[in-house]
Amino acid sequence: MDFKQHIAIVPDYPKEGIVFKDITPLMNDGKAYKAATDAIVEYANKRDIDVVVGPEARGFIIGCPVSYALEVGFAPVRKLGKLPREVITVDYGKEYGTDVLTIHKDAIKPGQRVLITDDLLATGGTIEATIKLVEELGGVVAGIAFLVELTYLDGRKMLDGYDVLVLEKY
């Protein structure tokens, strides 16, 4: 499926100079959303995944249906102060600023094989931080899946040595 048909291009959002790739039209089309989920599930099935991890918020949108289809758990990565129990944290840079990400300390057991999912690979800061959290807990990053990659931002260089699936590139 040509997923680009289901991704809206929004100039100057969230600020001037940014060309936002909006995945909500893809999610609004059940067949397209299912096809994207199925493509990631097919990729994950070859990697013996124990748990899916996704950063908020759009990583949840991708990761939850994938974890459901794989019959494995989903571990959310959230901004500081959003998870109720003991967490580990990491500071990170993103396309337009800096922030802190957290994951529950018991979300991943040492040796578990993890699939990280997110909607978009831009500069790579969010995923690099998510990888650090997973690996600090002893998880093995078995794969990383994105709907969209913005190749001109070179985020892929942050993922050298990791197996990456991207459904559409810009």
Swiss-Prot record:
Gene3D superfamilies, A to Z: 3.40.50.2020
Entry's EC annotation: 2.4.2.7
Function: Catalyzes a salvage reaction resulting in the formation of AMP, that is energically less costly than de novo synthesis.
GO cellular component: cytoplasm
Domain of life the protein comes from: Bacteria
Protein name in the entry: Adenine phosphoribosyltransferase
Protein's organism: Bacillus mycoides (strain KBAB4)
Main location: cytoplasm
Catalytic activity, as annotated: AMP + diphosphate = 5-phospho-alpha-D-ribose 1-diphosphate + adenine
Any single GO BP term: adenine salvage
Oligomeric form and interacting partners: Homodimer.
InterPro entries the UniProt entry points to: Ade_phspho_trans (IPR005764), PRibTrfase_dom (IPR000836), PRTase-like (IPR029057), UPRTase/APRTase (IPR050054)
Pathway: Purine metabolism; AMP biosynthesis via salvage pathway; AMP from adenine: step 1/1
Record has Transferase as a keyword: yes
